[in-house]
Amino acid sequence: MVTALSLLTACGGNPKTTAEAEKIDYTVEQFADLQILRYRVPGFEDLSLKQKELVYYLTEAALQGRDILFDQNGKYNLTIRRMLEAVYTGYKGDKNTPDFKAMEVYLKRVWFSNGIHHHYGSEKFVPGFTPEFFRQAVQSVDAATLPLAEGQTVEQLCEEVFPVIFDPTVMPKRVNQAAGEDLVLTSACNYYDGVTQQEAEDFYNALKNPQDETPVSYGLNSRLVKEDGKIQEKVWKVGGLYGQALEKIVYWLKKAEGVAETPEQKAVIAKLMEFYETGDLKTFDEYAILWVKDLNSRIDFVNGFTESYGDPLGMKASWESLVNFKDLEATQRTELISGNAQWFEDHSPVDGQFKKEKVKGVSAKVITAAILAGDLYPATAIGINLPNANWIRSIMVRNPLQSVTLQMLITRQLTATGSMRSLCTVMQSFN
């Protein structure tokens, strides 16, 4: 099984597999500051039929959330992407001109970054094609393929969107962290609409109870908007914001629930579906705790609103998904190391006052990624540490039986020529 990815590849198994993998040309394409690489998924063929079925259903669930992230990253991202795709597929003019070639690169960058801003630096892309070319190209394609609002003309669509694409002063930064500026108003991300930073902070501060030892992650799964002068949340759930995509995700999760490996995993999937259907953040915490406790399933996954780096206020989470399965051979090696954690602690080159007398809550596994989606794709993370709530992490510390290493992705780094550079183990220990 070979899958296209941007930078990092899933971990492998025995030396024979690695040697075979090194014969593959991993480079797919290179443009702008990006290099697209493909990666292998060793070990998939060794899974049982039921396990493969589970991976398939979870993979389908992962594929349904793509447009959620595009919209989270910017209000006009989906409209711009669909305009570009309509021209890319339907333009009848000369596709070898510098303008069309530049538009093609721009579209690929939009695909890669899930929007019109750089996936890492968050600055807006500068198009290498002219507004005149793009207007003529948009007007030349079948209007039925364009993302026109009800009653909107092609010209009106261009007037609405062109400043976002071509004016460097409009939405220049997806996430602005400059001191002294209103971080909400100056960030192009789509987590707030019509509210200022102060209004957003006041809204959520009013919800928080300093005495609550198990607080929910306020704002994690919603857009904060001001409508008719009233500030309110639009929750991401079935029947709410992003409801259509989430309904499809739940559909595939329901199928996955039917082939779950263990009762614990079945409970995890059921609780995640409940969260998507209700949008209740207490339910999300219950899901996170169940997920942490499930250490025996070989197939594992993340699907949901997880990391908050895309929000300038660090509250609202982008959607992402990862489906993986345990690499048994590599995990055995890792467990040998983690099982001797106390020895490493005792012999670490730090002052004795900083050493722990007893290391607890150490476990580890090495995984192979079957698919990544949303904010994990195509620019991948090398690890996902969940849950984010500090109080849940503290529970794991107090109860060593529930202490786990939340290590989600082990990668082989690829060189531009496709050779395997290193085997990276990313571990987060609660100890």
Residues covered by each model-derived region:
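Sec-exported extracytoplasmic/periplasmic mature domains
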Residues: 49-52, 59-64, 85-89, 258-261, ...
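C-terminal motif of bacterial Sec signal peptides marking the signal peptidase cleavage site
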Residues: 6-10
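Conserved catalytic-core segments centered on acid/base and nucleophilic motifs
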Residues: 44-47, 54-55, 256-259, 428-431
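Sec-dependent N-terminal signal peptides
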Residues: 1-5
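Contiguous, non-catalytic segments that form substrate-binding/exosite surfaces or channel walls
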Residues: 107, 111-428
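Bacterial signal peptide processing site
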Residues: 12-15
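Post-signal peptide N-terminal segment of secreted/secretory-pathway proteins
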Residues: 69-70, 75-108
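N-terminal-proximal low-complexity accessory segments that begin disordered
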Residues: 20-83
